[in-house]
Amino acid sequence: MKLLLNSSGSFSDNGTISVGDIPVHLESIDFDNDTDSDLIVVNRGDNSISLLRNDSGSFSENATLSVGNTPLKTVSGDWDNDSNTDLAVLASADNTIEIWLNDGSGNFSKASTQPSSSGSSPRDLISGDWNCDGYLDLATADYLGNSISLFYGQSSGADFSSPQTISIGKGPASLASADFNNDGRMDFVIAHRFYYTTSSLSLLTGDIGILLSESVSNGQVVYTSETRLAATTESQGTPPADILIQDLDQDSKLDLLLSLPINQKLAVLSGKNYTGSLNCP
């Protein structure tokens, strides 16, 4: 992994650090509470997580976590409410989320494993407070299940509810959340990637969908049917990948920024109707 240090807006080469096989995701958190930003690297090829400790800009391997099959992503949060930053790891081939708790010094131990729907092949994992009850929740994009799964945080910290599965369109691959309709509950944007197949061709394409919250029942958010939107105005080959929600033009409305890797472009969708917020009120 290559490190680039920023000095007054100019980046310089700070060397290379060896990590696991096929690193696919990188996250920056302070896992040892020394105010320096450390690094978490997800290695898909050897089912591991590399923990890189930051000592005043110099990184060294702190530990390697052995995790489930085909890890794709981590998200961080204080799952057990002890003021230390913990990890959730998405193991796609196992259809599970692993919860790893931090002792405050950067030592992680696996506390629980949350199963998702069998054969759903989740591709993305995000965290947030979906029902705005003060507990951090999790959500996965279930690529083969054509659904998203919501895992609601509990007062015990490392445990989550059984998944609430919401059926949506084909091939959900990535997620983002915000309160678009200002109702005090979190909504979702989903990037769909799928093949359009005819007798003569098979084309990787896609679109995006928006799920708006409608109510809460027994602690779970009830959502309206998914609204599907084209990712761009181009007619072919536009499967979106990552999603960023921000007020890009400072008009107090939430906009969408989508990466389109096949087209080597970014798409910007102006949020003309959404004056919501990025987090719970």
Model regions and ranges:
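Glycine-aliphatic tripeptides that mark coil-to-beta-strand junctions in extracellular
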Residues: 35-37, 83-85, 134-136, 184-186, ...
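Short, conserved, GDST-rich strand-edge loop motifs in beta-rich repeat architectures
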Residues: 193-203
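Blade-level signature of beta-propeller repeat domains, shared across WD40, Kelch, NHL, RCC1
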Residues: 239-249, 253-281
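Hydrophobic beta-strand segments that make up the repeating blades of beta-propeller
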Residues: 39-42, 87-90, 138-141, 188-192, ...
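Blade-edge motifs of beta-propeller repeat domains
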Residues: 4-21, 53-69, 101-120, 152-170, ...
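Beta-propeller blade termini
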Residues: 24-31, 72-79, 123-132, 152, ...
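A short loop-to-beta-strand structural motif that recurs across blades of beta-propeller domains
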Residues: 1-3, 48-52, 96-100, 147-150, ...
